[in-house]
Amino acid sequence: INSQSGKGGVGYILETKYGLNLPPKMREAMGYAAKGVSDHLHKELHPDEIFDLFKKTFENVGQPYSINEVHFQQTGEGITTKVTSTFNGKTITTEAVGNGRLDAVSNALKKAYELKYSLEVYQEHALERSSSSKAIAYVGIKKPDGTMAWGAGVDPDIIRASIDALVTAINNR
């Protein structure tokens, strides 16, 4: 893939070679990331380099925010969560409520760190066809300026994959 191939070529390679079915706008963001690297290096990117760039840029990026522990409880209000998270080495625990687990964690992080964003895109799928397969979740958050930040999370537990995707999107703001 070179700088002329665009987002379609990058998305096609990630889907056909690695089984990643990125949301359309995330595919576009990945295409721009690949183009930037291709332009900077003055060379075509091979499929493995594209996959490595995806993992480095969008998958399970755990800094400066990270999640240490999460607990959920079903209540009359929805899902209540207690999230222990770390930002730049400082660990805090926050409780929040949401209409689902991901929404509850998102609300806890917003409350803990006064973050401003809206959860806009969520997509998930299995990476293999077996009961022991890992899942991948994709999350897109809209920043106050209207631009999107993206994250992906990979884990055998889809809830953990979703939380990791959210944290990566926050870290990519």
Residue ranges and their predicted role:
Residues 1-173:
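Terminal or standalone catalytic/regulatory effector modules within metabolic enzymes
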